[in-house]
Amino acid sequence: MPISLKVLAPNKNVYQGEAEEVILPSTTGQLGVLPGHISLVTAIDIGVLRLRMNSQWQSIALMGGFAEIESDEVIVLVNNAEIGSDIDVQNAEQDLKEAKLVMTKFPENEKNSEKIKALQEISKAEARIQAAKN
């Protein structure tokens, strides 16, 4: 029996369908979900959700949020998400270059909100690139 998967962002239903396997980027590492998984709620990091159906893998870039897993259902609530095949790789690579350029303006040991935001932008761009290439 396949898993029912929903990926929801505040402004859109990103994905709704079935999967034989789901791999989530939780804040404690990759979390694999198969049918009959134990129920849990977990925080989702910026990263790539991978789903397998009929031996085909699909990727979705996630921008942080939460996931609820119940036996054969996974609901992912995220700040934003993009289906890998919809991502413009060149645009994502340009975003990564720009975010890395912003990072060069900060001393290595300095911590402030602008540096944290730049680090998040790097993570987002890397997730988008990874999702687009998988």
UniProtKB/Swiss-Prot annotation:
The keyword Ion transport applies. The keyword Lipid metabolism does not apply. It is a peripheral membrane protein. GO terms for molecular function: ATP binding; proton-transporting ATP synthase activity, rotational mechanism. GO terms for cellular component: plasma membrane-derived thylakoid membrane; proton-transporting ATP synthase complex. It is found in: Cellular thylakoid membrane. Belongs to the ATPase epsilon chain family. This is ATP synthase epsilon chain.
